[in-house]
Amino acid sequence: MLRVFEAFAGYGSQRLALIKANIPHEIVGISEIEGDVLLSYSAIHENLLEERNKNIKLTDDEMRDYLKNINIPLDYKTFENRADKLGGQKLKDMYIANKLNKNFGDIRSIDPKKLPDFDFFTYSFPCQDISVAGYQNGLVADSGTRSSLLWECCKIIEHKKPKYLMMENVKNLVGKNHKVNFNKFLLYLESLGYTNYWDILNARDFGIPQNRERVFCISILNPNEDFTFPQKQNLTLSMNDLLEENVSEKFYLKNNQVSDEPILQDYIYCLDSNYWKGTFLKDFLSKKRRQLVSGKVRPDGKYPARRLTPRETWRFMGVEDTNFDKASILVSNTSLYKQSGNSIVVPVLESLFKELFKSQ
């Protein structure tokens, strides 16, 4: 049984991939700070939708104290704790979710001596300060940027020495501005005895029709165990296969009959590298924004343009509708968009895990 710890867990795409790959495993703990994300994780993986109706003998202050102790939930931009702002069912949901998730909370506050043993450590650390579409503040150790949280993983890796590690982040991690820090981290892992294998994998090469390139780094502690990245697969799905047939009018742009010149295709698409969000077609045409919009082109060259629905964005990440449905009961559409954009494409992980754990 593979024992797994998910740092920067999100809604658990790694866990979904392990399940899809039929790899026996146990999640012994996670680290995640965002409240809505934790609700999604618990709804998908830990039966929160039923557990939330059970009685709790703790007072509101006792539940808040528990959350504060693991520094949850945090405002992702300011790292301000928001537990005092929770009340009623929202507070109860957050408390139950964190207990069910075995969430150790803010990675900066984790004492690795208090963590259970595990074989596999995943750490898809924040990309906002690395991404071309992000802030470009970098990931220098102790710089205080969100991407510099990568270095908080060192204490865990060094103390627990899991056999397998998996890092994931945007392609720009190995670009000219950040490659030096990426290499520095790899050298650190090598000093602990790890052998590192990294490559850039694209979602379209693993069954999902979107051009989403990400850096994956596999590190193995056993020097006698090799790793080869999975081979590319033929793409059989089209974008149309993942779109909903009947979409609410609220997803269509109000001033949507816009065109400067005809475009001779049935649909237009554009996929943001980090964050799913609707945009005006004018912005798309002027290339100011790179979000995905879709609309069937009329004969006169006009476009009834709309945003992708939250469900569609999760489909483009390889998440099944049943799991989306569980999460959507508890969190807003805005959060659902953000969660999918910050996650990892499940079929890519599935192929990678099948190769990594083929002897399991």
Swiss-Prot record:
Pfam families: DNA_methylase. The keyword Glycoprotein does not apply. GO terms for molecular function: DNA (cytosine-5-)-methyltransferase activity; DNA binding. Coiled coil: none annotated. It comes from the Bacteria. The gene is scrFIBM. CDD domains: Cyt_C5_DNA_methylase. The ScrFI restriction system has two different methylases. The active site is at C127. This is Type II methyltransferase M2.ScrFI.
